[in-house]
């Protein structure tokens, strides 16, 4: 099989990747990874919550849903100066991108001016700017793009087949429509999913097929490991076999060869050895900082120590800007 930018991946092909002996799968993933990226470098992003809790959505995994008693305190939209200070700390830690997350169904037009100012503040600090703020209405993507927003994050979470077991307050089609609006506005897409929602391997395969066959592949693909939150419907979810996480990372690398594959939420529960295996499988991006919105993350010093032990370095800012254009 020859890898091309226009390759169409069907589900049986992706399933066959998952079924490979792990050494063979890792070999193929690393081979593809080296064609497009420096295997000794990792992109670093920092995630900050700009509006916390009281979300109207019913995502069964989320601590921020107003429908579940998780003990999370609601916080209003923070001010621009707080975002600027977060960007300065992120840059000092080695991050090249600040990702801002807001617990909304979608931004209201009245909040757009504040979001625009936040984007400009991040850009003024020399970082790429990413925003995760739910569904985008018509015209909102264009305003954010004009402000200089590099990325908008909107995950698919899981497969179309399993989706209604996870979320019922927004449809899969609405998510795909938001991705289309992001692309049409000229921004890059950050879109991935979650492993451990109770889905089967077939759902992970279907999700990757959906991502790989979008009109333009997402330039950034976060793969999250579920962190069960007390009070949510998934508080007692069974953990996924760690090797299945590695297989998911490797398959993602193979079907999305030019995308940054981010080892996102759930690293705090991973051993250094498992994280190293995921990096060997093709993950080349992570979040720096001890918090991911409302959950724990390894602190930056621990990540720097791990990368040093692995002989790896953080990717410099100039390389991060050279990602595949939409």
Curated annotation (Swiss-Prot):
Subunit and interaction comment: Homodimer.
EC class name: transferase
Catalytic activity, EC: 2.8.1.6
General function of this protein: Catalyzes the conversion of dethiobiotin (DTB) to biotin by the insertion of a sulfur atom into dethiobiotin via a radical-based mechanism.
Domain Radical SAM core: 40-264
Species this chain originates from: Halorhodospira halophila (strain DSM 244 / SL1)
Any one Pfam family match given in the protein's UniProt record, by short name: Radical_SAM
Lineage: Bacteria, Pseudomonadati, Pseudomonadota, Gammaproteobacteria, Chromatiales
Name of the molecule in the record: Biotin synthase
Keywords (A to Z) from UniProt: 2Fe-2S, 4Fe-4S, Biotin biosynthesis, Iron, Iron-sulfur, Metal-binding, S-adenosyl-L-methionine, Transferase
Pathway as given in its UniProt record: Cofactor biosynthesis; biotin biosynthesis; biotin from 7,8-diaminononanoate: step 2/2
Biological process per Gene Ontology, one example term: biotin biosynthetic process
